[in-house]
């Protein structure tokens, strides 16, 4: 947790003043029982109305100053805690953006969301309560004991005993509940995971009529979380009854012993009332301290989870900002004996892959599900690093390019068409912030998207809702293709990004890309044989191995895997027409 405290930087003054003002409030609070004692022993005893009114005015003044001090402390602590949370959230978001796909795969999206939201909120609340109560509660306990000792050293022993007993009760309850709270936080991760899976895959769930099964799985996970929270809540609920029972018994003992002391003339009635008030102050402070410890314990657990992400350093280092000279005449992409295995996977996803793509070529990539098509493309983009072998673009190892230059060099259209809230123009300018309307329209024409964009009110200024939900699947795919074309990359990757397009639009798209993107190397990843058959050469993958690398006609004669794919999608007559 101490590693996270660097995020308080910039709010040191507020973090210092908050506990100081809380201690100032505590000082005034400690004087209240003495003023009440003086009212009883002097004002009421002597029937001195003026004295009573004067002391009542003093009580109001003490309350007003205490309130002002408390509000000031609350403002300072809230400012520091909110600033701390904002800085931590910003840095965590930035850090997650630096992680490679390997680290993100290992951590998982649901737990990242939980740590970015719930865990940081827990840490933020812990900081807020710490600034307010860490010094105040012990100060009140110690101050009340000193005040009680100044009134009656003998009865102070009772105070010390009660303080120890209440502290032991609080410690015992926390010792049991803290691990349960930690497990509950992990349970929240699992609930978040199931929720995300079901919302993202809602159509699939309904298509297979799995609503009841998914509901049953969610109910089971949610019930487990509920049981953990109930268990912690039931045990925590014992704290107030037990502590109040002990303190009330102590008050009874104090009244009995105090009455004896009053009869003996060793104490006044006002002093006994003051002792009872000090005991109440000790109880409330210990309970607040217990709340603080529970909150801090949760914050520590959440802080460890946040730190776990911050301490996860990417294995994929950016070589820097230096620009490499790109030789346009060199091979656009070259794989040499590349092998890659996903983290914790039992077998390689790609094995001994070797091929060459020249500038201006269109390369088709085809294979069955799980054959390694997307993995191969991810290595071109350097979303992952190969375990063995080398990947080179334009005569430079892909690892030598800075991430910024590599992203300009390679335009990617992923399988899932993702648009962002804003306008069509905003989305088109993601990779090229200074792109003109002419450049955007040119990209839209190539992507077969210009017609429906012109039909939108506002055209380029037409709004895009969250995830592009106000566009159809085919429209989203065409817009993401246009977005990748705007900066005119030297390599364009279409990773099964035309799956929602009809055959005519798909064919028009491939023709436009071929004719309008002179010198651009295009990788078309698809499960459709029709989408890749006109490529200059086609890479055929089967279970992570490259089993074919040739034009369509040659593969039909030499590659059984490719032939099976074609015959599974086309009749023999249709296949014959493609030769």
Pin down the residues of each PLM region.
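ABC-type nucleotide-binding domain
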Residues: 326-579
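Helix-loop-helix
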Residues: 47-54, 147-161, 231-305, 309-310
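Conserved catalytic Walker-motif region of ABC-type ATPase nucleotide-binding domains
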Residues: 96, 218, 306, 335-337
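Alpha-helical segments in transporter systems
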Residues: 2-5, 13-34, 55-59, 74-78, ...
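An intracellular "coupling" helix at the cytosolic face of ABC transporter transmembrane type-1 domains
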Residues: 10-13, 98-102, 118-127, 131, ...
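Transmembrane helices of ABC transporter permease
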Residues: 10, 14-27, 129-183, 254-267, ...
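Helix-loop junctions and hydrophobic alpha-helical segments within the transmembrane domains
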Residues: 92, 96, 205, 306, ...
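Transmembrane helix-loop-helix hairpins at lipid-water interfaces of multipass membrane proteins
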Residues: 9, 15-72, 76, 149-154, ...
């Amino acid at each position: 947790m101490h590693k996270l405290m660097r995020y308080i930087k910039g709010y040191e003054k507020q973090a210092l003043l908050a506990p100081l003002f809380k201690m100032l409030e505590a000082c005034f609070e400690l004087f209240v029982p003495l003023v009440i004692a003086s009212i009883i022993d002097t004002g009421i005893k002597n029937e001195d109305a003026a004295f009573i009114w004067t002391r009542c005015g003093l009580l109001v003044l003490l309350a007003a100053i205490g309130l002002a001090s408390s509000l000031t402390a609350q403002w300072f602590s809230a400012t520091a805690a909110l600033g701390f949370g904002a800085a931590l959230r910003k840095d965590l978001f930035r850090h997650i953006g630096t992680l490679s796909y390997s680290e993100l795969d290992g951590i998982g999206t649901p737990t990242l969301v939980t740590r970015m939201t719930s865990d940081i909120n827990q840490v933020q609340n812990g900081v807020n309560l710490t600034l307010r109560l860490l010094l105040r509660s012990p100060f009140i306990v110690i101050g009340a004991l000193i005040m009680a000792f100044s009134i009656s050293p003998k009865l102070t022993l009772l105070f010390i005993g009660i303080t120890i007993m209440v502290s032991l009760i609080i410690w015992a309850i926390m010792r049991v509940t803290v691990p349960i709270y930690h497990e509950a936080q992990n349970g929240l991760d699992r609930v978040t995971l199931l929720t995300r899976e079901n919302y993202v895959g809602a159509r699939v769930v309904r298509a297979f009529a799995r609503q009841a099964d998914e509901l049953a799985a969610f109910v089971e996970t949610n019930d487990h979380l509920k049981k953990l929270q109930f268990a912690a809540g039931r045990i925590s609920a014992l704290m107030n009854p037990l502590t109040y029972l002990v303190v009330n018994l102590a008050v009874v003992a104090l009244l009995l012993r105090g009455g004896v002391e009053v009869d003996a003339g060793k104490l006044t009635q006002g002093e006994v009332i003051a002792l009872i008030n000090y005991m109440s102050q000790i109880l409330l402070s210990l309970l607040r301290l217990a709340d603080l410890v529970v909150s801090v314990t949760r914050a520590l657990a959440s802080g460890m989870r946040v730190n776990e992400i911050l301490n996860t350093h990417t294995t994929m280092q950016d070589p820097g900002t230096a620009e490499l000279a790109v030789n346009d005449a060199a091979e656009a992409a070259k794989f040499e004996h590349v092998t890659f295995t996903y983290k914790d996977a039992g077998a390689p996803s790609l094995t001994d892959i070797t091929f060459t793509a020249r500038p201006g070529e269109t390369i088709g990539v085809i294979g069955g599900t799980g054959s390694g098509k997307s993995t191969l493309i991810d290595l071109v983009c350097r979303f992952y690093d190969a375990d063995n072998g080398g990947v080179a673009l334009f005569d430079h190892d892909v690892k030598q390019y800075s991430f910024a230059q590599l992203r300009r060099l390679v335009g990617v259209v992923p399988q899932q068409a993702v648009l962002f809230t804003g306008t069509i123009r905003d989305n088109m300018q993601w990779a090229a912030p200074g792109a003109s309307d002419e450049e955007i329209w040119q990209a839209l024409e190539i992507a077969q998207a210009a017609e429906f964009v012109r039909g939108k009110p506002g055209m380029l200024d037409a709004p895009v809702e969250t995830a592009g939900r106000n566009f159809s699947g085919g429209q989203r795919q065409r817009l993401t293709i246009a977005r990748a074309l705007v900066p005119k990359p030297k390599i364009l990757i279409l990773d099964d990004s035309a799956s929602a397009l009809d055959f005519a639009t798909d064919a028009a798209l491939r023709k436009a890309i071929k004719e309008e993107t002179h010198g651009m190397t295009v990788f078309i990843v698809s499960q459709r044989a029709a989408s890749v058959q006109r490529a200059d050469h086609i890479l055929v993958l089967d279970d992570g191995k490259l089993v074919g690398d040739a034009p369509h006609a040659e593969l039909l004669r030499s590659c059984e895997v490719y032939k099976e794919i074609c015959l599974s999608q086309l009749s023999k007559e249709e296949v014959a027409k493609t030769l």
